Amino acid sequence: MAAKPEWVEQSPEEIEELIVKLHKEGQSTSQIGITLRDQHGIPNTKAVLGEKITDILKRNGTDFEYPEDLLNLIKRAVNIREHLEENPKDIHTKRGLIKIESKIRRLVKYYTRNNVLPEGWRYDPKTAALLVK
Protein backbone atom coordinates (compact mmCIF):
# COMPACT_ATOMS: atom_id res chain seq x y z
CA MET A 1 0.00 0.00 0.00
CA ALA A 2 1.33 3.43 -0.93
CA ALA A 3 1.90 6.01 1.77
CA LYS A 4 -0.56 8.83 2.32
CA PRO A 5 0.55 11.88 0.30
CA GLU A 6 1.76 14.71 2.50
CA TRP A 7 -0.40 17.36 0.79
CA VAL A 8 -3.67 15.63 1.77
CA GLU A 9 -4.94 17.71 4.69
CA GLN A 10 -8.26 15.95 5.33
CA SER A 11 -8.52 13.25 7.93
CA PRO A 12 -9.69 9.78 6.87
CA GLU A 13 -13.04 10.40 8.59
CA GLU A 14 -13.58 13.61 6.61
CA ILE A 15 -12.73 11.85 3.36
CA GLU A 16 -15.14 9.04 4.17
CA GLU A 17 -17.94 11.52 4.93
CA LEU A 18 -17.18 13.29 1.65
CA ILE A 19 -17.41 10.00 -0.28
CA VAL A 20 -20.79 9.18 1.27
CA LYS A 21 -22.04 12.74 0.62
CA LEU A 22 -20.98 12.61 -3.04
CA HIS A 23 -22.70 9.25 -3.48
CA LYS A 24 -25.92 10.60 -1.96
CA GLU A 25 -25.74 13.42 -4.52
CA GLY A 26 -25.94 10.78 -7.24
CA GLN A 27 -22.32 10.36 -8.30
CA SER A 28 -21.02 6.94 -9.30
CA THR A 29 -17.88 5.50 -7.73
CA SER A 30 -15.71 6.52 -10.67
CA GLN A 31 -17.14 10.07 -10.60
CA ILE A 32 -16.43 10.22 -6.86
CA GLY A 33 -12.81 9.25 -7.49
CA ILE A 34 -12.44 11.93 -10.16
CA THR A 35 -14.02 14.56 -7.90
CA LEU A 36 -11.73 13.64 -5.02
CA ARG A 37 -8.70 13.81 -7.29
CA ASP A 38 -9.54 17.03 -9.15
CA GLN A 39 -11.29 19.14 -6.52
CA HIS A 40 -9.89 17.89 -3.21
CA GLY A 41 -6.35 16.78 -4.11
CA ILE A 42 -6.83 13.19 -2.97
CA PRO A 43 -5.06 11.09 -5.61
CA ASN A 44 -5.96 7.62 -4.39
CA THR A 45 -8.44 6.68 -1.67
CA LYS A 46 -6.83 3.29 -1.19
CA ALA A 47 -3.51 4.98 -0.34
CA VAL A 48 -5.16 7.37 2.12
CA LEU A 49 -7.87 5.19 3.68
CA GLY A 50 -6.63 1.69 2.97
CA GLU A 51 -9.81 0.62 1.18
CA LYS A 52 -11.63 1.24 -2.08
CA ILE A 53 -14.53 3.63 -2.59
CA THR A 54 -16.95 0.73 -3.15
CA ASP A 55 -15.86 -0.90 0.12
CA ILE A 56 -16.41 2.38 1.99
CA LEU A 57 -19.88 2.78 0.48
CA LYS A 58 -20.83 -0.84 1.27
CA ARG A 59 -19.72 -0.36 4.86
CA ASN A 60 -21.90 2.76 5.07
CA GLY A 61 -25.04 0.96 3.95
CA THR A 62 -24.98 1.24 0.16
CA ASP A 63 -25.40 -2.05 -1.63
CA PHE A 64 -24.66 -2.34 -5.34
CA GLU A 65 -26.79 -4.81 -7.25
CA TYR A 66 -24.50 -4.82 -10.29
CA PRO A 67 -20.90 -3.68 -10.77
CA GLU A 68 -20.47 -0.24 -12.31
CA ASP A 69 -18.33 -1.36 -15.24
CA LEU A 70 -20.91 -3.94 -16.27
CA LEU A 71 -23.75 -1.39 -16.09
CA ASN A 72 -21.77 1.09 -18.19
CA LEU A 73 -21.22 -1.52 -20.91
CA ILE A 74 -24.90 -2.50 -20.84
CA LYS A 75 -25.90 1.18 -21.21
CA ARG A 76 -23.63 1.49 -24.24
CA ALA A 77 -25.11 -1.66 -25.78
CA VAL A 78 -28.67 -0.38 -25.24
CA ASN A 79 -27.83 2.97 -26.84
CA ILE A 80 -26.22 1.26 -29.83
CA ARG A 81 -29.25 -1.01 -30.26
CA GLU A 82 -31.52 2.06 -30.32
CA HIS A 83 -29.24 3.61 -32.94
CA LEU A 84 -29.33 0.43 -35.04
CA GLU A 85 -33.14 0.40 -35.01
CA GLU A 86 -33.07 3.75 -36.80
CA ASN A 87 -30.00 2.94 -38.93
CA PRO A 88 -30.11 -0.79 -39.75
CA LYS A 89 -27.43 -0.57 -42.47
CA ASP A 90 -24.78 0.87 -40.18
CA ILE A 91 -22.47 -2.14 -40.32
CA HIS A 92 -19.62 -0.48 -38.44
CA THR A 93 -21.85 0.14 -35.45
CA LYS A 94 -23.10 -3.46 -35.64
CA ARG A 95 -19.50 -4.59 -35.31
CA GLY A 96 -19.07 -2.29 -32.29
CA LEU A 97 -22.19 -3.78 -30.70
CA ILE A 98 -20.84 -7.29 -31.19
CA LYS A 99 -17.59 -6.31 -29.48
CA ILE A 100 -19.37 -4.60 -26.56
CA GLU A 101 -21.70 -7.56 -26.01
CA SER A 102 -18.68 -9.84 -26.08
CA LYS A 103 -17.11 -7.74 -23.31
CA ILE A 104 -20.37 -7.95 -21.36
CA ARG A 105 -20.44 -11.74 -21.62
CA ARG A 106 -16.80 -12.03 -20.52
CA LEU A 107 -17.45 -9.74 -17.53
CA VAL A 108 -20.57 -11.73 -16.59
CA LYS A 109 -18.53 -14.92 -16.71
CA TYR A 110 -15.88 -13.34 -14.46
CA TYR A 111 -18.41 -11.95 -11.98
CA THR A 112 -20.36 -15.22 -11.71
CA ARG A 113 -17.09 -17.08 -11.13
CA ASN A 114 -16.24 -14.65 -8.29
CA ASN A 115 -19.78 -14.71 -6.80
CA VAL A 116 -20.54 -11.06 -7.54
CA LEU A 117 -23.48 -12.03 -9.76
CA PRO A 118 -25.85 -14.95 -9.10
CA GLU A 119 -24.92 -18.25 -10.73
CA GLY A 120 -27.60 -18.31 -13.44
CA TRP A 121 -27.42 -14.63 -14.43
CA ARG A 122 -27.33 -14.08 -18.19
CA TYR A 123 -27.12 -10.98 -20.35
CA ASP A 124 -30.27 -10.59 -22.42
CA PRO A 125 -30.42 -7.63 -24.83
CA LYS A 126 -34.22 -7.47 -24.54
CA THR A 127 -34.24 -7.01 -20.78
CA ALA A 128 -31.03 -4.95 -20.68
CA ALA A 129 -32.93 -1.73 -21.37
CA LEU A 130 -35.05 -2.33 -18.27
CA LEU A 131 -31.94 -3.01 -16.21
CA VAL A 132 -30.24 0.32 -16.90
CA LYS A 133 -33.28 2.62 -16.78
Curated annotation (Swiss-Prot):
What the entry lists under Gene3D superfamilies is as follows: 4.10.860.130, S15/NS1, RNA-binding (1.10.287.10)
Molecular function via GO? small ribosomal subunit rRNA binding; structural constituent of ribosome
UniProt source species: Methanosphaera stadtmanae (strain ATCC 43021 / DSM 3091 / JCM 11832 / MCB-3)
In which family does this protein belong, per the annotation?
Belongs to the universal ribosomal protein uS15 family.
SUPFAM superfamilies listed in its UniProt record: S15/NS1 RNA-binding domain
Q: Where is the signal peptide?
A: none
Q: Does the keyword rRNA processing apply?
A: no
Q: Self-association or partners: how does it assemble?
A: Part of the 30S ribosomal subunit.
Any Gene Ontology biological process: translation
- Name the InterPro entries for this protein: Ribosomal_uS15 (IPR000589), Ribosomal_uS15_arc_euk (IPR023029), Ribosomal_uS15_N (IPR012606), uS15_NS1_RNA-bd_sf (IPR009068)
Entry protein name: Small ribosomal subunit protein uS15
